[in-house]
Curated annotation (Swiss-Prot):
Function of the molecule: Converts 2C-methyl-D-erythritol 2,4-cyclodiphosphate (ME-2,4cPP) into 1-hydroxy-2-methyl-2-(E)-butenyl 4-diphosphate.
Transferase recorded as keyword: no
Keywords for this protein: 4Fe-4S, Iron, Iron-sulfur, Isoprene biosynthesis, Metal-binding, Oxidoreductase
Family to which this protein belongs: Belongs to the IspG family.
Xref: InterPro entries: Dihydropteroate_synth-like_sf, IspG_bac, IspG_bac-typ, NO2/SO3_Rdtase_4Fe4S_sf
Pathway where this protein functions: Isoprenoid biosynthesis; isopentenyl diphosphate biosynthesis via DXP pathway; isopentenyl diphosphate from 1-deoxy-D-xylulose 5-phosphate: step 5/6
Descriptive protein name: 4-hydroxy-3-methylbut-2-en-1-yl diphosphate synthase (flavodoxin)
Catalytic activity field: (2E)-4-hydroxy-3-methylbut-2-enyl diphosphate + oxidized [flavodoxin] + H2O + 2 H(+) = 2-C-methyl-D-erythritol 2,4-cyclic diphosphate + reduced [flavodoxin]
Residues spanning the signal sequence: none
Binding residues annotated for [4Fe-4S] cluster, in chain numbering: 264, 267, 299, 306
Protein encoded by which gene: ispG
Length: 356
């Protein structure tokens, strides 16, 4: 299947381009109180080193808004303010923030939205129309119920509202907590506008459940060419959100970066400690940004075949094994020497690619 991404309008959040031909960016959201400036900066630095591109923060009141101004001045990443109920907070934050997310289900009247738009237009920052299945405007929930039709009605209504105000720096999200409904919502809206989409399954749960739900929903949409920026929503797992999001992009084949590790699940043929080896390899290669296929296999049944498609590979045997690079055996060593030599070959491969 040939991957073909929808051509969307391009916007900018800080120094990060979204839409058009820009790479799909990965977002997260802080879970500390925004008024805790030091706590927020600590989490922002963690996300920066984890590989996040953009971060969103909640803003409940003016204490949060004033703290956010200080945080923004020291942040290593572009920041989006997440606004519910009080549009005046969005207007205040628009003076210094990189983007605003509004929930059309609770932001209030047209006049409220108009004030937010004027503030964002003045600073040329984008607005995300964040439609959420759990908080749709009454006019649409009364007419359709809490379903895809109501979400679609809300999105189209608010898009037109912003366009009528001559505002087009828009991105849209259509989030639900259900995998199938999330897919259907984004698919329904995609042919009807050319604005970039922010993908996510809302309230996806803890690490295990979020990984499963997000992989199915976001992977499905990405393979259909839908999506310009994304978040894997995960209860209490900051860096893991980024790691899973990057893995979805890589393993779907949509965006090549970092190491793709091929390893067998082990069986009765294994005569080495493959599980220990793969844990070491994962830890020692997680810093690599260059796209690289590596294979760590426990016996000869599939090892040599997988090695032909890998940049660097290990084929374990009984008390010994092979290190293979681009299909050619480069070393036959004792088991306790294999992983170290393998990692040297991996680093050498990375250096060669970085030179190119």
């Amino acid at each position: 299947m040939e991957y073909q991404r929808y051509k969307t309008r391009q916007i900018k959040v800080g120094d990060v381009l979204i839409g058009g031909d820009a790479p799909i960016s990965v977002q997260s959201m802080l879970f500390t109180k925004t008024r805790d400036v030091e706590g927020c900066l600590e989490q922002l630095n963690r996300l920066y080193f984890a590989g996040a591109n953009i971060v969103r923060l909640a803003c409940l009141d003016m204490a949060d808004a004033r703290a956010l101004k200080e945080i923004k001045a020291k942040s290593p990443l572009p920041l989006i303010v997440d606004i519910h109920f009080n549009h005046k907070l969005a207007v205040f934050c628009a003076e210094f923030i990189d983007g605003v997310r509004i929930n059309p289900g609770n932001i209030g009247s047209k006049e409220n939205i108009k004030e937010v738009v004027q503030a964002c237009k003045q600073r040329k920052i984008p607005i995300r129309i964040g439609v959420n299945h759990g908080s749709i405007e009454k006019q649409f929930s009364d007419k359709y119920g809490y379903n895809i039709e109501a979400m679609l009605g809300s999105a189209l209504y608010n898009i037109k509202l912003l366009e009528d105000l001559d505002f087009f720096d828009i991105k849209i999200s259509m989030k639900t907590s259900d995998v199938q409904n999330t897919i259907k919502a984004y698919e329904a809206l995609r042919p009807l506008c050319d604005y970039p989409f922010h993908l996510g399954v809302t309230e996806a749960g803890t690490k295990f459940h979020s990984t499963v739900k997000s992989s199915i929903a976001l992977g499905n949409l990405l393979l259909k060419g839908i999506g310009d920026t994304m978040r894997v929503s995960m209860t209490g797992e900051l860096e893991e959100e980024i790691r899973v999001a990057r893995a979805i992009l890589q393993d779907s084949g949509v965006q090549k970066s970092g190491v793709n590790i091929i390893s067998c699940p082990t069986c009765g043929r294994i005569q080495s400690d493959l599980i220990k080896a793969i844990k070491i390899v994962e830890e020692k290669t997680k810093h690599i940004k260059e796209p690289l296929n590596i294979s760590v296999m426990g016996c000869v049944v599939n090892a040599l075949g997988e090695a032909k498609g890998a940049d660097v590979a290990i084929a374990f045997g009984k008390n010994q094994g092979l290190v293979i690079r681009h299909g050619e055996v480069v070393a036959k060593l004792k088991e306790d020497e294999l992983v170290d030599r393998f990692l040297l070959e991996v680093e050498d491969e990375v250096k060669l690619r970085e030179k190119d």
